[in-house]
UniProtKB/Swiss-Prot annotation:
This is 3-isopropylmalate dehydratase small subunit 2. The gene is leuD2. Pfam families: Aconitase_C. One of its GO terms (biological process) is L-leucine biosynthetic process. Gene3D superfamilies: Aconitase, domain 4. The lineage of its organism: Bacteria, Pseudomonadati, Pseudomonadota, Betaproteobacteria, Burkholderiales. Belongs to the LeuD family. LeuD type 1 subfamily.
Amino acid sequence: MQAFIRAHGIILPMNQDHVDTDAIIPQRWLVTVERDGLADGFMGAWRYDEHGQPRPECVLNQPAYQGAAIVLARENYGCGSSREHAVWAHQGYGIRAIVAASYGPIFHENCLKNGLLPITLPAADVATLMAQALADPGCACEVDLVSQRVIGPDGRAYPFEIDAGRRQLLLEGVDDIDLALARAADIAAFQRRQQQDQPWLA
């Protein structure tokens, strides 16, 4: 997993509540179990019409937002069904972090496990950032995990909270599999002890 220290980039504003995982990555892009190749499916139903042509009104198709790295959203972002593809689609598109007022809980956990930083800010702060992003298309902000701050387009700093353990794993680029492999010797020792002490479980 790629370590996350800080990210600076164009803000991609998703100016509505309850953006669900079906909107983030529609079902027809779920035919793979690979992480790669999902960039085209990111917000696919919004980006393309029924003929597969780009919808010009969608922010993802507007020149100012090309190369965006930080999604800005409102309430309950990533709600709906559980699908890691929703996280992988963000990453495939180039998104490093999300700033929102709240999240679907499963999506939030999947983000943390896959190295996509989900930041929660008060709704009033999100509204301020959203107004700036919409007034100045293509403006950028910075997310700093070390100092736990979002730096808005105007230079204002917004502090955020994150679980200390998850923060450390993100800073080190360590996922759950890496963590288990690092403790392989301890796990093997536990299994041996358990077989000796509780052989009926073998």
